[in-house]
């Protein structure tokens, strides 16, 4: 008999969530009594605080009143907040009649066994029916359980970007410490900052500029145009051959005396005799038969 009464109350009992904190049971009853006779109207309060939890239960005398209330009041405003109205059903666990009358053993049908919104963690409504609008929507976008991770949600601050930036800076500091330790172990040879700044990865470092660069007049073509090493060798060989020719000319001038540089000093280059020319006739130009 008691179970049959509970089943009858269950069919005519509705769950009202998203209630404003200042809505009273009398206001709630006067709002829903147009859809049928109400036998019970309760707003749930906290056991420890005694404050309203934002939801309540209404029991009609028949099922039709409950259905009409759900049809016309679900998603409407009450006390400047949008409310949700659904069928109420007892939680699994076999509560007695007194617990059902207190409302502690009921939840909205089709919504699971929890009576809190996972968005704002407020009781009395579900995520899809969350009445938070305007600033409240921004404030309760993240569950309250994550507030300790994010920071000041009430101040509309999102510190994920700051945390990522700080994490990136910490990685850079760790890398700097690693490279400094490696440089210390290797005797200062591997300074990654110096290596990347200089642009030459394998060339040795000189203490003075003249040790690295020759005077402008002695620079080779390969230095200006980045020629390979074998071109540099050809340049050196050419300079050696030029040096050998100059030394041969000096030896020849010393050997023949008057054919040395002193005799040709001040004369144009074309008028100077070649290394195999006979001495020119006095006052004349050497002829072709004088060469051998």
From Swiss-Prot:
Name this polypeptide is given: Glycine-rich RNA-binding protein RZ1B
SMART domains: RRM, ZnF_C2HC
Chain residue ranges for the region called Disordered: 93-114, 180-292
Compositional bias (Basic and acidic residues): 180-210, 220-268
Induction (record text): By cold stress. Down-regulated by dehydration.
Disruption phenotype: No visible phenotype under normal growth conditions.
A Pfam cross-reference name: zf-CCHC
A biological-process GO annotation: negative regulation of DNA-templated transcription
Subcellular compartments: Nucleus
One GO MF term attached to the UniProt entry: DNA binding
Keyword Transmembrane: no
RRM domain mapped to chain residues: 12-90
